[in-house]
UniProtKB/Swiss-Prot annotation:
GO molecular function: GTP binding; ribosome binding
InterPro entries xref list: G_ENGA, GTP-bd, GTPase_Der, KH_dom-like, KH_dom-like_a/b, P-loop_NTPase, Small_GTP-bd
Family: Belongs to the TRAFAC class TrmE-Era-EngA-EngB-Septin-like GTPase superfamily. EngA (Der) GTPase family.
Protein name: GTPase Der
Length: 436
């Protein structure tokens, strides 16, 4: 199951970003007193009562030059589409406004649970105002103060109560789940159609975790796969086409549920900043990654073009140096046959376990080749290493002092591990721990 998604909805200047930052535990959004100022990150992981969940600040979803109320409506619609639980936030100092009532009218239509949060109630006297908000029709209002962090525990308890009722879409561990992500119009749907048109592919559609998400299950060479949220790739409409951050939000949810992520680039347009941002989310989530250059048929080529394009990708995506780069055309289906083998290989490497004795031979050979660094007269000593997890493969190296493990030496060890075991298509993580 993907993590539950909680969306914070409300008119501008009710304190959505402050609460978002409080819950996320870090200052992610830009917080000012000017309406509509949220510009930065709108999506963050958070944790409460042993629940991991994703948090959205819909104020960060910029609809463009639409009228004020239209923007609020569209942000609320997106929250209703994407969230499992909605926090409807109002300003306790200003009472119920017509804009609050507009948001309430939209939220009446949703079957998703709505938790009403009355912000900016910084002391007990102010809480006398809370009863006015029962008129909005969402039951008990939760008094909170974003500035002082008051009342957030009760608010999150109320959200967590609803997490228990979220339906799970659980595939067996043998099923490889993957998604294709990328900017609008890079050809994600066309790639899916071209893949599913291959002779060896047997297709069926299954319901995803949200009411409008459809996953596509298929079998390839007797292995079962699921393409996560094929409905999201095909979603049209003004909000979805024009809102860059909406497409990122949808991609993040798909990444969360996937083992392997295909980052799709448009060969005609080259590499844009948004491509790097979207790819960065897959890397940060520790997923296996394959880079797919689509629309290769539309590019004028000579014998150097592909190599130069790949070099350009490597320069822009240095954090994805482990990801294979595939060139293909969904339109002509040329090289489409290379995609499934690459996904299978990345998935296998993402789950690969290596023997401890072989791993330690590799580590000790690496140390002999390149002695450990020193700092202030102390030298790093490596005692032994062991693999502690897969998806992604994660290793703990036991040392005398973790502070002496410089990132460049950690990178050197990673490269030696990759030389020995491959791991193409997957990130690997290395943690230094003091031997007890």
């Amino acid at each position: 199951m993907g993590k539950p998604v909680v969306a914070i909805v409300g008119r501008p200047n009710v304190g959505k970003s402050t609460i978002f930052n409080r819950i996320a535990g870090e200052r992610i959004s830009i917080v000012e007193d000017t309406p509509g100022v949220t510009r930065d990150r709108i999506y963050s992981s958070a944790e409460w009562l042993n629940y991991d969940f994703n948090l959205i600040d819909t104020g960060g979803i910029d609809i463009g030059d639409e009228p004020f109320l239209t923007q609020i409506r569209q942000q609320a619609e997106i929250a209703m589409d994407e969230a499992d639980v909605i926090i409807f936030m109002v300003n306790g100092r200003e009472g119920v406004t017509s804009a609050d009532e507009e948001v309430a009218k939209i939220l009446y239509r949703t079957k998703k649970p709505v938790v009403l949060a009355v912000n900016k109630l910084d002391n007990t006297e102010m809480r006398a105002n809370i009863y006015d908000f029962y008129a909005l029709g969402f039951g008990e209002p939760y008094p909170i103060s974003g500035t002082h962090g008051l009342g957030l525990g009760d608010l999150l308890d109320a959200c967590a109560e609803h997490f228990k009722n979220i339906p799970e879409t659980k595939y067996s561990d043998d099923v490889v789940q993957f998604c294709l992500i990328g900017r609008p119009n890079v050809g994600k749907s066309s790639l899916v159609n071209a893949m599913l048109g291959e002779e060896r592919v047997i297709v069926s559609n299954v319901a995803g975790t949200t009411r409008d998400a459809v996953d596509t299950a298929f079998t390839y060479n007797q292995q079962e796969f699921v393409i996560v949220d094929t409905a999201g790739m095909r979603k049209k409409g003004k909000v979805y086409e024009t809102t860059e951050k909406y497409s990122v939000l949808r991609a993040l949810k798909a990444i969360d549920r996937s083992d392997v992520v295909g980052v799709v680039l448009n060969a005609e347009e080259g590499i844009l900043e948004q491509d790097k941002r979207i790819a960065g989310y897959a890397h940060e989530a520790g997923k296996a990654v394959v880079i797919i250059v689509n629309k290769w048929d539309a590019v004028d080529k000579d014998e150097r073009t592909m190599k130069e394009f790949e070099q350009n990708i490597r320069e822009h995506f240095q954090f994805l140096d482990y990801a294979p780069v595939l060139f293909m055309s969904a339109l002509t289906t040329k090289r489409i046959h290379t995609l499934m083998p690459a996904i299978i290989k990345a998935s296998e490497n993402h789950s690969l376990r290596v023997q401890t004795n072989v791993l330690n031979d590799v580590i000790m050979d690496a140390v002999a080749m390149n002695p450990t660094p020193t700092h202030n007269g102390s030298r790093l000593k490596i005692y032994y290493a062991t693999q502690v997890a897969v998806k992604p493969p994660s290793f703990v190296v036991f040392v005398n002092d973790p502070e002496l493990m410089h990132f460049s030496y950690e990178r050197f060890l990673e490269n030696r591990i990759r030389d020995a075991f491959g791991f193409e298509g997957t990130p690997i993580k290395i943690f230094a721990r003091a031997r007890k």
